[in-house]
Amino acid sequence: MNIKTLCHPEYKRISVESLLNPVEETIDCEKPHSQTKINTAKPISASLYVTTNNTAVVQHNVQKRKGVTRRCPQCAVIKTSPQWREGPDGEVTLCNACGLFYRKIFLVFGKDLAKRYFNEIKGVSVKRKVPKSLYGVTRTR
């Protein structure tokens, strides 16, 4: 589709109001443009639209993204984030930021040191940088 096709007079122009207000349209592409049937709908509720001539009822399942509200044991933040990560205890309990930091410490220093460090800084507001106290420590398995 090129710009000439989009600007062709047979195509309906879309206004800002039509984008902001929900409109139900049925267009049969096999019919010529003059025979195209357009039904505009008026919103009744968040999940139901009825056409203006009451000939058809269309159900729309509008579902908001629901997340589970959790509390990160490391930084004590409460989030409804869909992304939770594995922590030192092996469970998916850390928020995304703490989980990424734990994984970084885990890959560099091993499970034992990462778990020990996370237990030391638990509940303390700390920048998520590799601590100087762990520099020079070799990785343990």
UniProtKB/Swiss-Prot annotation:
User: What is this protein's record name?
Assistant: Protein GAT3
Per the record, the gene is GAT3
One GO BP annotation is: regulation of transcription by RNA polymerase II
Q: Which SUPFAM superfamilies match?
A: Glucocorticoid receptor-like (DNA-binding domain)
- For whether the record's keyword set contains Metal-binding, the answer is yes
Keywords annotated in UniProt: DNA-binding, Metal-binding, Zinc, Zinc-finger
- Zinc finger (GATA-type) boundaries: 72-98
Example GO molecular function? zinc ion binding
Cysteine pairings via disulfide bonds: none
Q: What Pfam families does this protein's entry cite?
A: GATA
InterPro entries in UniProt: GATA_TF (IPR051140), Znf_GATA (IPR000679), Znf_NHR/GATA (IPR013088)
Query: What is the source species?
Result: Saccharomyces cerevisiae (strain ATCC 204508 / S288c)
